[in-house]
A protein has these predicted regions:
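Glycan-recognition and catalytic cores of secretory/periplasmic carbohydrate-active enzymes
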Residues: 1-298
Length: 298
């Protein structure tokens, strides 16, 4: 406004008044248009992408605000979107709106939210999230896996019968189910030492290796998962009282500056529940009564 006022030899407040009046007239004119329809439903896979982003941002930027957003979404999804399969097993719904969850989740929902919960665990070291993340991968292995040609079908074996079961490998605006699943499988393998997870991840890679060289832009997230595997990701275990300055310093040093391709686990010295399913934390004492960090690469 000041520059325009000088150029036109008027008071800056007059420029602001003109702009404000114009904005009000434009808004009034736009308000007369038919408003576009708005879809407020929650989609599990999209929320998985968002929750993971907030959880990782919380770690990298040391932001408790982002951490709380990730936790709140994880609590909402895991409490409101549970389902039961026809065999009576635990499953998930894809959408949630107005207090109602429905539509059986697709492979992309399971895979994206499994990755999200792994990241929420890394941001909080709360052991409750990893078993849920594991269940979100174990269920697709049982009900979505293609035993003949490898990879996850988009639909489960208890979805409605289709002419053919689709299988998505191409990464477009959002990652494919198989790309997300491959990364989740590799991360869980490092945290749990369950070699079956690594085996399934490598089987996902195998059929598409010939296509990666000719069309790499179609497999951006799959290539990221392959890079995660080939880089020999770091495994970091942090042991110490979570609220202590020493432990917080170790957490910050682990995440800053940003370096991808690692898994991070943490526990307090006497929290036996936190180590039950995480071999990375076993037999990791504090050193001389102080918080300690253990790191390794395969």
């Amino acid at each position: 406004p000041e520059t325009l006022a000088i150029e036109n030899q008027v008071n800056p407040d007059e420029i602001r008044r003109i702009v404000r009046d114009a904005q009000e007239k434009l808004f009034a004119a736009r308000a007369q248009r038919v408003h576009p329809g708005t879809d407020y439903k929650l989609i599990m896979s999209w929320n998985g992408l968002m929750t993971r982003a907030f959880a990782e941002a919380a770690c990298i930027l040391d932001s408790d605000k982002y951490r709380q957003i990730a936790i709140a979404n994880a609590q909402l999804v895991t409490s409101k979107m549970q389902a039961t399969t026809p065999e009576g097993e635990h499953g998930w719904f894809r959408t949630y709106k107005d207090g109602r969850a429905h539509i059986d989740a697709f492979a992309e929902d399971y895979a994206a939210y499994a990755n999200a919960l792994i990241s929420v665990y890394e941001a909080t070291f709360d052991p409750e999230w990893l078993p849920i993340a594991r269940s979100m991968i174990d269920s697709p292995i049982s009900h979505f896996w293609d035993d003949k040609d490898a990879g996850f079908f988009s639909t489960s074996d208890y979805h409605e019968t289709l002419v053919s079961r689709p299988k998505d490998f191409y990464d477009n605006a959002v990652p494919s189910a198989n790309s997300e699943a491959a990364e989740a499988l590799l991360r869980l393998y490092l945290l749990t030492a369950n070699s079956e997870y690594e085996t399934f991840a490598l089987r996902i890679f195998q059929p598409f290796l010939p296509a990666l060289g000719s069309a790499p832009t179609s497999f951006g997230r799959l290539l990221s998962a392959i890079d995660f595997y080939l880089s020999g990701p770091a495994e970091v275990a942090l042991i110490g009282p979570f609220e202590s300055d020493a432990m917080q310093d170790l957490v910050r040093a682990t995440w800053q500056p940003y370096a991808p391709n690692k898994v991070v686990a943490g526990t307090e010295p006497k929290d036996n529940d936190a180590t039950l399913d995480i071999p990375l934390l076993e037999n990791r004492p504090m050193l001389h009564g102080k918080a300690a960090a253990y790191g390794c690469r395969d």
